[in-house]
Amino acid sequence: TEPNAGSDASKSQTEARLEGDHYVINGAKIFITNGPEAGVFVIFAMTDKSKGTKGLSAFIIESSFPGFSVGKVENKMGLHGVHTSEIVFTDMIVPKENLLGQEGKGFKICMQTLDVGRIGIAAQALGIAEGAMKEAVEYTKTRVQFGKPISKFQNTQFTFADMALRC
C-alpha cells in the first residue's frame, strides 16, 4: 500500500532505476505489518512508468540496505502484538540480483499475492462475524424483557435467521 495509491498496485509511485549492478529505489509503503521488526520485504516499484502496470517490478529488499528506514508506526485500536508502520526508501541501493522475476512482471506477482491475501482476510472476517453472532445469541438468552428472554421473541429469531444466512 502506498500513500497515494491505496491498494491499487497500478498506481504505485515508488520508483526503481537500474544503475550498473544495482537498483536505486525511492518511495514509501504504508500499513506494513511487522515493518519495524522485519528484516526482509518484498516490495513493488515502477521500473518504467511509461508502461503502466507492465512497468511494475518486484524486489526482495532488506532493512539493512542503505537508504531503507522505518517511518511512522501506527497507533492501532487492536492487534497490538503486531506493529504496523510505514517503510521509506531514500536512494535505497538494491543489488540487481534482488529483482524478483523479470522487470515488468511485478504486477502479475502482486495480483497473485493479493488474491491469496484477500482469501485470508475474507476467512478472518467470516470468523469474526460468526463469533459475534454466537455472543449475540448468548446475550439474548440472558436479557429479559416483558418477563422472558428476548431470544424467545419472534423478531429476534428472524434477525438471527437473517444473520445466519449471511455468514
Give the predicted meaning of each segment.
Residues 3-7, 30-36, 79, 116-120:
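Glycine-rich phosphate/pyrophosphate-binding beta-alpha loops
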Residues 8-11, 62, 88, 94:
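Structural signature of FAD isoalloxazine-binding scaffolds in flavoprotein oxidoreductases
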Residues 8-10, 34-39, 52-55, 80-82, ...:
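Short glycine/proline-enriched turns and hinge-like loops at secondary-structure junctions
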Residues 14-17:
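A structural signal for short hydrophobic beta-strand segments in well-ordered beta-sheet cores
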